[in-house]
Structures are given as structure tokens and as C-alpha cells.
Design a protein with these regions (language model features):
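Conserved SAM/AdoMet-binding glycine-rich loop
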Residues: 1-80, 87-88, 94
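Short linear capping/connector segments at secondary-structure termini
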Residues: 3-6, 104, 148
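Well-ordered, non-membrane alpha-helical segments in soluble/globular domains
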Residues: 16-21, 156-164
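Secondary-structure boundary/capping positions in well-ordered alpha/beta enzyme cores
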Residues: 31, 57, 150, 174-175
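Short, hinge-like loop/turn segments at secondary-structure boundaries
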Residues: 51-53, 80, 118-120, 148-150
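Glycine-rich tight-turn/loop motif centered on a GG-T
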Residues: 71-82, 146-154
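Conserved C-terminal portion of the radical SAM core fold
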Residues: 83-142, 158-176
Length: 177
């Protein structure tokens, strides 16, 4: 599988995206695509093409949900709300395309209880696949500056593992993690 993971792999004119995807599919032994993107970088025109692509090759579209909490999404400057994620996931899944999501446990302002609360909301989404990430603070970013000025709670490794387990226990059982 060719994995278009980094950045927003649907943020370009459709003809450019088609060239990229078709070029990847032309490589020997590439049997399908996994396209990671943002929920606010999807259009009906692109979904039409992805539906056609899905009819002739293996395809997964993954969305960076990150959180279901709109306050958190604003805090981390995502530029979209949770409803945007819900819509994009539904529109993609309803076209028969395998649909994935990415969430981050431990975002600023989200404690263990908040993360666990979100599992049932994520379970209600039309997701086939879910990837769970830990919070990463990268030097030179706005989040790193914020943390240096006013540190917020970070999970210890044991707290993160316990939170993941509790989250998974509440997640819909047919979602591939």
C-alpha cells in the first residue's frame, strides 16, 4: 500500500491529486492507497473520484479527528470543529470507502476522564479503523511554547497505558485499532 500520511493529502487541485494517486498505483507491487487528510480538506468532487478509485483498488481514507471536544480543537488551532469530522467520515463511509480516524489522548485540557468520555462518541462515528496517538510536543511549535510558559499535565507512560485500556474497553468492538 502507498501511504499518503504526512500533511493533508487532499489539499491540492483534483487534477494534481489524481496524478499523485495514479502515479503511486502505477508502481509495481502497490495494491492500494491509504490517504491521510483533514476533515476540512474534502469535497464532493474529490469524494466522487475516491469512490471511483475505490471501485478499482484497495482504498482507506483516514481523518485527523484528534478530539471530539470543540474547546480542545480551538485550543490546538485545528481550524475545524468535531461536526466537520463527523460529516467527512459519514460522507466517505457512505460511499463504501473504508474510513479511518486518528485521535490523540492527553491533549491540553483533556484528562483521563475526558478521554474516556470521548470513546463512546468516537464509537458512534462510521469508522472502520481508529489510530490512537499519544500527545507529542515538538520543539519550536506553538504548543511547545505554551508548555514552556505554563506547563500542563502530561500523562506518565503508565497513565497513558491505563487511559488507552479504559478507552479501548469503551470503544465499539468492530473498529479495527
Amino acid at each position: 500500500l502507498a501511504y499518503f500520511q504526512a500533511y493533508s493529502n487532499t489539499y491540492a487541485p483534483l487534477d494534481v491529486l489524481k496524478r499523485r494517486y495514479e502515479e503511486a498505483l502505477a508502481v509495481d507491487d502497490v495494491v492500494g492507497l491509504v490517504i491521510g487528510t483533514r476533515p476540512d480538506c474534502i469535497s464532493t468532487e474529490l469524494l466522487d473520484y475516491l469512490e471511483e478509485l475505490n471501485s478499482r483498488t484497495f482504498l482507506i481514507v483516514e481523518y485527523g479527528i484528534e478530539s471530539v471536544n470543540d474547546d480542545t480543537l480551538r485550543h490546538i488551532n485545528r481550524g475545524h470543529d468535531f461536526e466537520c469530522s463527523r460529516r467527512a467520515i459519514e460522507l466517505t463511509h457512505d460511499r463504501g470507502i473504508l474510513t479511518g480516524g486518528h485521535i490523540i489522548l492527553g491533549l491540553p485540557g483533556e484528562d483521563r476522564e475526558e478521554n474516556i468520555r470521548q470513546a463512546s462518541i468516537v464509537s458512534d462515528l462510521k469508522l472502520d479503523i481508529l489510530k490512537i496517538h499519544q500527545l507529542q510536543i515538538i520543539r519550536g511549535t506553538q504548543l511547545a511554547d505554551e508548555y514552556m510558559q505554563q506547563p500542563f499535565k502530561l500523562f506518565t507512560p503508565d497513565e497513558y497505558i491505563d487511559t488507552c485500556i479504559a478507552y479501548l474497553e469503551r470503544l465499539r468492538s468492530d473498529i479495527i485499532v
